[in-house]
Amino acid sequence: MIDIQNLEDHRKINIQKVGVKGINYPIVVLDKAKGTQHVNASINMYVDLPHHFKGTHMSRFIEVLNEFRGEINIRTFHTILEKVRDKLKAESAHMEITFPYFIEKTAPVSGAKSLMDYICAFSGMNAENKKDFLVGVVVPVTTVCPCSKEISCMGAHNQRSHVTVKVRFKKFFWLEDIIRLVETSASGEVYSLLKRVDEKYVTEQGYANPMFVEDVVRNVAERLNENSNLTWYSVEAENFESIHNHNAYAYVEKE
């Protein structure tokens, strides 16, 4: 049978990334409290494609994933990419793994327990003379506007916010530690389950601890700077403004 992908392309244009997106795949991640956690991940995989090849072989990405079924994690990440490079005869390979991670949280007053989900990601690339790997997590928090509190006789506008942290690191660390750092760097935390006594507590706590979006990214960055295990980080915060039809945003990264 003729292999169309291997035919020569005459347009002389290299493709930096070509591959498959949105592969739903079960993986196992380490859980600080329970040991391991089984999650359903969405995986993107790419390779470079030299200008003289018409196309890549999409099925080979899935074949490699199947070889590592049950063993897709931080430790095997670059092994998988090296296998992809070899199987597709590519100079570079890239992979992005996004998954929901669940932590049991306890309501601050009633003690009610519930599961809270956080979107986490592993991403990186592997080439002959270069490797890169990042861990990312999106943490929901709340913010109360300091300006609104200052000028209002009663109350202040508040909103849910997403803080996204991405890090490069030397040694293993727990996702829970980054999540906790972020949650305690904003006006307040987000919970899946709150009783009335808890709602009162988190409302008053947020009001007593107002922050701009700028304060949140600086607070998180200041505490990440204290962690010598991290070689690089980025922090972005987005407030879903309750009194505007737009969002507030701030970004900082380690220089």
Curated annotation (Swiss-Prot):
The record marks 145 as: May be catalytically important. The lineage of its organism: Bacteria, Pseudomonadati, Thermodesulfobacteriota, Syntrophia, Syntrophales. Keywords: Hydrolase. Belongs to the GTP cyclohydrolase IV family. Its EC number is 3.5.4.16. It is an enzyme of class 3 (hydrolase). InterPro entries: GTP_cyclohydrolase_FolE2 (IPR022838), GTP_cyclohydrolase_FolE2/MptA (IPR003801). It comes from the Bacteria. One of its GO terms (molecular function) is GTP cyclohydrolase I activity. This is GTP cyclohydrolase FolE2. It catalyses: GTP + H2O = 7,8-dihydroneopterin 3'-triphosphate + formate + H(+). One of its GO terms (biological process) is tetrahydrofolate biosynthetic process. Coiled coil: none annotated. Pfam families: GCHY-1. Pathway: Cofactor biosynthesis; 7,8-dihydroneopterin triphosphate biosynthesis; 7,8-dihydroneopterin triphosphate from GTP: step 1/1. Converts GTP to 7,8-dihydroneopterin triphosphate.
